[in-house]
């Protein structure tokens, strides 16, 4: 089987047990508010209040974007010490996105209603590295997992992507590296592990984590699952045991399916947009009705309860995934009763249709 329970070791944080289901925070698609500072107008995201609440409690991991840090979107105006580093201290690992998600104007039209979004100009590789230098230079550095600057690199040869990422990661040796592979053919939009050579896989051994965005694995669910399986098998054959990170792959149904074929790290803002109820993601607005909060609850109260319950659901799902591996994929009773049979049937199909799961090619 391709699924496993691994451990990654961070230079500052030590050993971290996987899988990790990483709550992400981003200004994209959420409302920007304004405040005045020294006669200038400052934009900050309403998500900062979620981040403040999240940071008040210990957590295994969190993700923020260098784009938002650079523009001060997570600087809360009411706080005497508003810098977001304050909110991140309680997380054992802090994943830093290079800003690729925020630099793309598209918002998933199939998702819940989001605010109109236009990326700000003036953020690129140099600004990203400036954020890294500032965070790495703190008297007490954060336990960072950093990505390569992947925006605009689609179509670059894989060896070029690898060389550029190595140069960046070498300058920040106290950070764990998370190399995001982008489609490497001139017109390619999808990652195709089946086209990677043994040398390509071997060249990835210098990184700590290998990342792919969910969207660049394909539009169809089963195609994405097959590509993750091929990537995991290729890495294993190349003697690379580091985890696969599915960027944007945080979902109560999709995350287990990706985990079953070897991915171990998943992030996303879905936990801020949806409500996780009975093992599935539902419209957040109706959460008060189907939960114990009640139909008379205000939108603010409903949102607060949904966020807190979502974090509990992610923690429970993490434990379930670990138990599933412990039982060698033969039991599904650790998952929510509403979805366990569906996951069982899906995995049986995957085993019969994806040779890599049982060691084939």
Predicted regions and their residues:
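Alpha/beta catalytic cores of nucleotide-metabolism and tRNA/nucleoside-modifying enzymes
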Residues: 1-56, 236-244, 252-361
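Non-catalytic, usually N-terminal nucleic-acid engagement modules in DNA/RNA processing proteins
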Residues: 1-176, 351, 355-361
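A structural motif
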Residues: 140-143, 207, 263
């Amino acid at each position: 089987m391709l699924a496993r329970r691994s451990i990654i070791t961070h230079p500052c944080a030590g050993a971290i047990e996987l899988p990790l289901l990483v709550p992400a925070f981003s200004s994209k698609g959420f409302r920007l508010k304004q405040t005045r500072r020294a006669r200038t107008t400052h934009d900050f995201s309403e998500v900062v209040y979620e981040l403040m609440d999240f940071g008040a409690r210990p957590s295994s991991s969190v993700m923020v974007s260098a784009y938002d840090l650079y523009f001060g979107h997570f600087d809360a105006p009411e706080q005497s010490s508003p810098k977001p580093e304050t909110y991140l201290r309680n997380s054992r690992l802090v994943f830093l996105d290079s800003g690729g998600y925020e630099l793309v104007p598209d918002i998933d039209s199939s998702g819940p209603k989001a605010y109109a979004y236009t990326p700000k100009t003036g953020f690129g590789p140099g600004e990203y590295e400036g954020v890294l230098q500032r965070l790495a230079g703190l008297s007490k550095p954060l336990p960072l997992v950093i990505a390569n600057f992947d925006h605009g690199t689609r179509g670059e040869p894989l060896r070029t992507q690898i060389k550029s990422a190595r140069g960046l990661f070498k300058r920040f040796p106290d950070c764990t590296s998370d190399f995001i592979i982008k489609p490497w053919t001139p017109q390619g939009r999808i990652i195709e592990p089946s086209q990677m050579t043994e040398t390509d896989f071997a060249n990835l051994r210098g990184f700590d984590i290998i990342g792919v965005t969910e969207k660049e694995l394909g539009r169809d669910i089963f195609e994405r699952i097959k590509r993750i399986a091929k990537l995991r098998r290729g890495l294993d054959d190349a003697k690379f045991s580091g985890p696969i990170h599915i960027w944007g792959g945080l979902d109560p149904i999709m995350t287990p399916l990706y985990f079953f074929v070897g991915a171990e790290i998943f992030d996303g803002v879905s936990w801020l947009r949806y409500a996780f109820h009975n093992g599935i993601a539902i419209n957040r607005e109706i959460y008060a009705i189907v939960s114990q909060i009640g139909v008379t609850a205000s939108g603010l109260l409903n949102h607060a309860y949904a966020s807190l319950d979502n974090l509990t659901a992610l923690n429970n799902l993490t434990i379930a995934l670990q138990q599933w591996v412990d039982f060698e994929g033969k039991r599904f009773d650790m998952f929510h009763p509403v979805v366990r049979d569906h996951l069982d049937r899906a995995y049986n199909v995957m085993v019969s249709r994806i040779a890599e799961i049982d060691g084939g090619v």
